[in-house]
Amino acid sequence: ZPIDLMGKVFVFDKELSPBI
């Protein structure tokens, strides 16, 4: 499920970089 993975990565990236 690439979509689920993308969503997880997006959330993870947002949590890591709250500046963006």
Swiss-Prot record:
It is found in: Secreted. Residues 1-20 form the Pentraxin (PTX) domain. Keywords: Amyloid, Lectin, Secreted. The keyword Flavoprotein does not apply. GO terms for cellular component: extracellular region. Homopentamer. Pentraxin (or pentaxin) have a discoid arrangement of 5 non-covalently bound subunits. This is Serum amyloid P-component. It comes from Pleuronectes platessa (European plaice).
